[in-house]
């Protein structure tokens, strides 16, 4: 036994020496924290957190974007009392016609059609008999359309994400404050039964003092990639890095942690894996090797708030996993 122990000890020593020789630490990587300052607020503007707009007896709605999500939204709105769909817009005339069929099948009047031009949406925003513009286009047009609609006297509802840069976020905020028009990001997960039940439990004190919340968007989009107009969503992931669809997890987490109602997000650290499935999918479809695919398969972001709470947000649309938002609440 003593001999075996001695041999084992020698082996461990040799392994340790070999590892120390072959796995010498590399020069430390330099990380420069990115500090984001709140820009100077325009004089005289008030926030819109508690904005109440004058009552509208019948809300007249125009839809921009009738591809992946738009037709479903049109269909749902045919069931909402006190609303009227008055305008439909898409670059493709065929898509507009398909949504007109939805109205016809619901026994509703045909809406004004806009299509055939990349600027056709502006004509919809300028149409006088519209109260609300519903935007369901590709992401890069969301903020521009929202700002233009509010500047033309319309309330705005935008599918997530409502904006892609900090500059765009502040454009939406400033325009909403200036025009006193609602600008709502249509984050549906904050209204799902599980998230609302959990929020109610948290507000009733079931979890005690909530310290940590987790959420995610885990959704393998392999079956959906071909349906996106001009391949815009895969293209965005190829050219951009990070959690590009954060609010499914972050929205419910912010509600529970009372973000902007006594607390605020202050610091984040985010990491991603290497890109594997994105480049593999493109090669499978086109036969071409992808030399530079920016977004990793999995992105994990840890956020700390001013009051010392944390949230963990994950994003993964590439790997073959079951759909999950991985919602969890940790209290003390």
Question: Where do the protein language model's features map onto the residues?
Answer:
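Beta-strand-loop-alpha-helix segment that lines the small-molecule cofactor/substrate pocket
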Residues: 138-139, 143-191, 205
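N-terminal Rossmann-like NAD(P) cofactor-binding module of classical short-chain dehydrogenase/reductase
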Residues: 132-134
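Bacterial N-terminal signal peptides that target proteins for export
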Residues: 1-8
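Predominantly a Rossmann-like dinucleotide-binding segment in NAD(P)-dependent oxidoreductases
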Residues: 179-184, 189-293
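N-terminal Rossmann-like dinucleotide-binding module
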Residues: 22-106
